[in-house]
Structure formats: structure tokens, C-alpha cells
Design a protein with these regions (language model features):
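Conserved N-terminal segment of class I S-adenosyl-L-methionine
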Residues: 1-89, 93, 106-113, 118, ...
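Short catalytic micro-motifs in class I SAM-dependent methyltransferases
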Residues: 98-102
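A short acidic, helix-capping loop that chelates divalent metal ions and anchors anionic groups
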Residues: 136-140
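Residues that cap or initiate secondary-structure elements
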Residues: 134, 185-186
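Short beta-alpha junction loops
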Residues: 61-62, 131-134
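Conserved beta-strand signature within the Rossmann-like core of class I S-adenosyl-L-methionine
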Residues: 123-131
Length: 186
């Protein structure tokens, strides 16, 4: 879906604010709510402050375009895999919110490893959120990229260097069961 979990949004934005990144890559932006949150809270909603943070979005489905995309300095219309293969940039913060479940486990782990090893700047953070329960979903809105292919558990991340489990998948105060993980490049 072109939207993520409301209950994870507050955790993601909190981590972004605590890290205060100068460069942010948002992978799988959907309608662009993460960009709006970053501009609203990190840049205090003031257009002149936008230059303090470079915000790049990647989205594989052009039809998700919304006015929130204007919060980004640039939105690349391509798959996450192609972007990671063809970009040499490094970022202080990379977001994968409600994206990981769209890859099988092997591909998801390969993407995480590529991000941490080649796309995160030293001391940078990767923030991942994904449902902690299986939700059957096919090609929503005619978008094959929306198909759910995997279920992740916090134990899938244990042992990775720099991992901090922010939300472990247990039901939260809103009734959601989400996993939120921060990986810091050491």
C-alpha cells in the first residue's frame, strides 16, 4: 500500500530527529508521508530550512505520486534494487518503512547488507519497519511491487552489527503489531 503504519511513523520520526541527519534516503516512499514528517519536524516546516537536509525518495510505482512528493529534493522512479545498484551516494539516514515484507527473505537480507555496507555513511542509520504478522496482499492498485513475500521477526536481525530493536512486534497501545529496527553503521 502507498501508506505505512501509523503506529510506526512516530517511532521512525523520533529516531530521525534524534539522529539529526543531513542526508536522508527514503526507499519506497508511496505517497510520501515520511518526507512530509521529516520536513515538518526536522526542518520545522520552514521552507528555508529545507536546505539543511537533503531528502531523496525512491518509488517504483509512478501512480503513487502525490503533493507530498514536493517535500523531497528528488524522487527517483525506479526499483529499490536498481537505485542501490546505480547510485554511488551515501546517506546519514535511510528509511525502509513498510517495504521489507515486499521482498523474500534472501533478497531482503541482501538489500539490508548492501545498504549497510555501501549506502550508509559512517555512523549512519537504517530504519526498517515491517508488519510483525502475516498480512496476505497481492498486487494492490495493479502494482506488483505491493505483493507481500515475507514475514520478519526481531530475531531475524539479532546478531547483525549495530542493531537496536525499537519495536519488537508485540501489540502496541494502538493494537498494531509492528517491528521497527535501527541499524547503525559502526
Amino acid at each position: 500500500m502507498p501508506i505505512g503504519s501509523y503506529s510506526s511513523f512516530r517511532d521512525i520520526i523520533r529516531q530521525v530527529l534524534m539522529h539529526n541527519p543531513k542526508t536522508v534516503l527514503d526507499l519506497g516512499i508511496g505517497h510520501g508521508i515520511n518526507g512530509a514528517g521529516i520536513r515538518n519536524w526536522l526542518n520545522v516546516g520552514i521552507k528555508e530550512n529545507y536546505k539543511q537536509t537533503t531528502l531523496i525518495g525512491v518509488e517504483g510505482f509512478r501512480q503513487y505520486h502525490s503533493p507530498l512528493w514536493d517535500c523531497y529534493d528528488l524522487v527517483e522512479i525506479t526499483t529499490i534494487q536498481d537505485y542501490l545498484d546505480n547510485s554511488n551516494a551515501q546517506y546519514d539516514c535511510i528509511l525502509m518503512t513498510d517495504v521489507l515484507e515486499h521482498f523474500d527473505k534472501d533478497e531482503g537480507n541482501a538489500i539490508i547488507n548492501k545498504i549497510v555496507n555501501t549506502k550508509l555513511a559512517p555512523g549512519g542509520i537504517l530504519l526498517v519497519s515491517t508488519p510483525a504478522v502475516w498480512i496476505e496482499q497481492g498486487a494492490a492498485y495493479g502494482n506488483e511491487l505491493e505483493t507481500h513475500r515475507s514475514l520478519w521477526h526481531f530475531t531475524d536481525f539479532i546478531g547483525m552489527p549495530g542493531v537496536e530493536i525499537i519495536k519488537d512486534g508485540r501489540e502496541d497501545d494502538m493494537g498494531y503489531m509492528m517491528l521497527v529496527v535501527k541499524i547503525t553503521k559502526v
